[in-house]
Amino acid sequence: MKCSVHKISDIKKFPESMTVEDILVQSSNIGTVKIAKKIGEKKYKDFLKDLNLFNSPKFELDEIGSPIPFKWNKCKLETISFGHGITTTPLQAAAAYAALINGGMLISPTLEKDKNNNVKFKRIISTETSKKIKKVLRKVVTDEKGTASLADVFGYEVLGKTG
């Protein structure tokens, strides 16, 4: 598969037809590009915005990192779909993944307890979708074809995504 002058490939040969689950569990770059194109650039970009991946995180520390600004140009949809083309801080990545598996709520990370015990959150996906994503991310670690089997630690429910 090509995007402009860049070749997009997989580390190994995959079947022509794969389920979304298999694409994610086995980490097919070509498959994730196809999924992203099916979703469409606008919806994909809006979802990344909902996850707060385009802005500097709001946090109580002055030394908080900022994502490198980028332009949404040719091949950006494709490269972001398989984990390249966008930078995030570890805090942003943790908050985004937490939202995907905690029932769909994006929670603003904080070090300070709110005096009224208010938690700032925003629903970004349905509870049902979150359950499905959690199942797939667990299979990335536990499935024989999963790409993160070394992360499967006895006594812990580890979820993951490589690539």
Positions of the model-derived regions?
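Beta-lactam-recognizing serine transpeptidase/beta-lactamase-like catalytic domain environment
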Residues: 1-163
